Amino acid sequence: MCDDDETTALVCDNGSGLVKAGFAGDDAPRAVFPSIVGRPRHQGVMVGMGQKDSYVGDEAQSKRGILTLKYPIEHGIITNWDDMEKIWHHTFYNELRVAPEEHPTLLTEAPLNPKANREKMTQIMFETFNVPAMYVAIQAVLSLYASGRTTGIVLDSGDGVTHNVPIYEGYALPHAIQRLDLAGRDLTDYLMKILTERGYSFVTTAEREIVRDIKEKLAYVALDFENEMATAASSSSLEKSYELPDGQVITIGNERFRCPETLFQPSFIGMESAGIHETTYNSIMKCDIDIRKDLYANNVLSGGTTMYPGIADRMQKEITALAPSTMKIKIIAPPERKYSVWIGGSILASLSTFQQMWITKQEYDEAGPSIVHRKCF
């Protein structure tokens, strides 16, 4: 299928925070840009500047000082379809420079998403972009493909949603899927809040992007939260400095590990939910007793919010505490896990056995958007 660029499938992983897009068969996405649409807050006065009424992705990011930034995908669910269409248009025509009507397109979504969401995705792909064929795959399943396994439990945590999906011999076990609407964006918001306690005020949508950068560069997961808090209180060894875009330097201490600790203790942001170690355990316990051993031994991490240093060791420690004492527990944290959903999509869309799985334009015309529930698990 990949002998020429004419018929190569496109793989587009629409995350709440980043869009990862490229061609099936490639080993990494060609385009990675923020899922942001920005609109000017001010009136344009310079004639001939060619100001636009909206900016997408990196361009919106670079002009953020004069824009209001909006994310069309919240908690993995597309909430603003007009903006989402702009993002897809930008992906096809500006980033990948392809005509979507010539390429089958694989999209991704979070498990347990509303049915209407995938129907609308299908409808826009066929009716607005005229793709010849498309498919919607579950993100966590693709991550498992990328790790070269058919059995395991995936903890996929991105910017908008975190979920545990147990998969056995290639089958996702829907009754055991755990979904947690707490992910990278909530951690960024929490970091904004606790930095305010230090006297640094971050409020606007543009400043949130600065805090996200602080989080990505400096945050880490503590192996033992109480110990780490004590260390931070007694010495300044954990403090790091960060230079803001205007040259001001701020110092950040225990916020570095208090921020991602929320994943293990959602009560930090007032959520009643269990932490990611407990949802993983609960998900395994909802599976058949015979397959739990294989799941414990194949805990695969995926998504940008699993990129914190120390997260794998902490997961190992927490799950070991919950599991039976003789159980062998292994956490797999591939270095490329930030993009493993996309990589899995690239693998899937280039398999010869997958080619009969596409929803074709003809099938869509006959059955309408609801075909997506029959063809895509």
From Swiss-Prot:
Keyword match Calcium: no
Species per Swiss-Prot/TrEMBL record: Xenopus laevis
Modified residues (N-acetylaspartate): 3
SMART domains listed in its UniProt record: ACTIN
Residues recorded as bearing N6-methyllysine in the entry: 86
GO terms assigned for molecular function: ATP binding; hydrolase activity
Major location category of this protein: cytoplasm
Record protein name field: Actin, alpha skeletal muscle 3
Residues the record lists as Methionine (R)-sulfoxide modifications: 46, 49
